[in-house]
A protein has these predicted regions:
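C-terminal alpha-helix
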Residues: 181-192
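Catalytic histidine-centered segment of alpha/beta-hydrolase-like enzymes
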Residues: 134, 158-177
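Conserved alpha/beta-hydrolase "acid-adjacent" motif
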Residues: 133-142
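Short beta-strand/loop motif that positions the catalytic acidic residue
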Residues: 119-120, 125-128, 132
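C-terminal structured domain segments across diverse proteins
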Residues: 93-94
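Short, conserved loop/helix-junction motifs that constitute active-site signature segments
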Residues: 116-121, 147-152
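Alpha/beta-hydrolase-fold enzymes
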Residues: 1-87
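Active-site nucleophile elbow and catalytic-triad environment of alpha/beta-hydrolase enzymes
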Residues: 97-116
Length: 194
């Protein structure tokens, strides 16, 4: 993650963490606010979002109910972001993106060392987006190198052409291409267990 490499840990703590104001639920809690996440995501593809809203306006003027409905459905979900706790966000920046604990073999969860090489009977599928500008290609592929004792025939790496970060999890290509591959993979190895 380029941003995590370019900035010191203290920058994230002082610039990205804010206190929830009164009278909101969670008042005084320290969080990485959803609105900051949203701004960060949208600024990566500013021109595309501006164009989408121009199209939305034109669909409204033209009475194109389908275009309006698709836009609203997409943005209702896209704009639904939650605050992340200070602890979760800062630990992720520090231990995952800056210090690379998992590939270095020093990542702990609930005081237990995580050992990916101990995984032997679980199939592994990773999915990445060709155009993902948040989690670049290779970030989840690394799991294949870390899980050394999963047989090769139980591993699948899928790079989805033509999608960015959001498209890996949602949208037409997710529904028509990624999700069916995931289900096929899950069912294949679920049947082998029985």
């Amino acid at each position: 993650n380029k941003l995590a490499d370019e900035r010191p840990f203290t920058w994230f703590k002082s610039n990205m963490i804010h206190t929830v104001p009164m009278p909101n639920l969670g008042a005084f809690r320290r969080v990485y606010p959803g609105f900051v996440q949203l701004y960060s995501f949208m600024s990566l593809n500013k021109d595309r979002h501006i164009e989408a809203h121009k199209d939305y306006f034109n669909h409204l003027v033209e009475g194109d109910g389908d275009g309006v409905s698709k836009h609203r459905k997409f943005y209702d979900e896209y704009l639904s972001v939650l605050d992340l706790t200070e602890e979760f966000y800062l630990q992720t920046i520090e231990k995952v993106f800056q210090e690379h604990h998992l590939p270095r073999g020093c990542f702990y969860h609930r005081d237990r060392l995580v050992k990916p090489e101990k995984i032997t009977k679980v199939a592994l599928m990773t999915v990445e987006g060709e155009l993902d500008d948040i989690s670049g290609i290779g970030q989840t592929q690394a799991a294949h190198d870390l899980c050394t004792n999963i047989p090769k025939d139980m591993k699948l790496d899928h790079i989805q052409k033509g999608v960015g970060h959001y498209g890996v999890f949602n949208g037409r290509k997710f529904r028509e291409e990624i999700y069916p591959k995931q289900m096929e993979f899950i069912l294949k190895y679920d049947k082998q267990k029985k």
